[in-house]
């Protein structure tokens, strides 16, 4: 592992430790079920697309790690993730709301046999080199569905267009008040790649089997 990736891995461990200390609220699945009406309007509609900062399918969050969902919502609250709709929603939530909603979505994923330890399909030679360069498995796991810590996302099978938009957001200039995601780890990694390379990574990771899914739901229950 080169010096840059070694430094980023150290930052990853430090950030996980810091977040685990900060997160104290315990999530309640049943309470979360009563709080997700605002989420269903986008994340509960198969194929639903957002238009900011460009058109892409909204991420699948059913089956995602609760700690990651909570961390993402806190990042929107703080403005570390820049998205007008998500910031407006996140700032309306209490710490307990976030914990409850995250707990609900974590158990809402695909059911059945465990995923294999390795991805369901092999990458091309080009993509394999890109994955190695980014050391993606170091945090997201060998099959991209079992990250080293639950405050990191499962990305296997996630919508490829969403992954591409997210990766580009990490590359964005941190001084831009309207666009981007502030994350030292992912920022350092994503800036090593061209947008074409990021798209190739996103297309591969989005094509493999994962736990995530969209569960169609009505807001009127």
Which residues make up each language-model segment?
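Sequence/structural segment immediately N-terminal to covalent heme-attachment motifs in c-type
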Residues: 24-49, 119-144, 159, 217-221
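Bacterial N-terminal signal peptides that target proteins for export
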Residues: 1-8
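C-terminal capping alpha-helices of c-type cytochrome domains
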Residues: 91-114, 188-217
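Gly/Gly-Pro-rich "capping" loops immediately C-terminal to redox-active cysteine motifs
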Residues: 29, 33, 47-76, 87-92, ...
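Residue-level hotspots at or immediately adjacent to binding/recognition sites across diverse folds
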Residues: 23, 45, 89, 142, ...
């Amino acid at each position: 592992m080169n010096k840059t990736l070694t430094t980023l891995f150290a930052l990853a461990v430090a950030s996980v430790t810091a977040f685990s200390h900060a997160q104290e609220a315990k999530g309640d699945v049943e309470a979360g079920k009563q709080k997700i009406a605002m989420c269903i309007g986008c994340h509960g509609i198969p194929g639903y697309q957002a238009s900011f900062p460009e058109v892409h399918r909204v991420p699948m969050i059913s089956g995602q790690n609760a700690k990651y969902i909570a961390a993402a919502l806190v990042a929107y609250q703080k403005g570390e993730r820049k998205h007008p709709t998500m910031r407006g929603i996140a700032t309306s939530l209490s710490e307990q709301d976030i914990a409850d909603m995250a707990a609900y979505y974590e158990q809402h994923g695909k059911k059945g046999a465990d995923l294999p330890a390795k991805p369901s399909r092999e990458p091309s030679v080009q993509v394999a080199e890109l994955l190695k360069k980014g050391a993606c498995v170091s945090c997201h796991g060998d099959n991209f569905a079992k990250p080293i810590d639950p405050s990191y996302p499962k990305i296997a099978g996630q919508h490829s267009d969403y992954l591409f938009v997210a990766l580009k957001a990490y590359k964005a200039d941190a001084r831009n008040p309207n666009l981007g995601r502030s994350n030292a780890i992912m920022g350092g990694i994503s800036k090593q790649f061209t947008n074409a390379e990021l798209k190739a990574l996103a297309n591969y990771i989005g094509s493999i089997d994962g736990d995530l899914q969209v569960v169609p739901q009505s807001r009127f229950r």
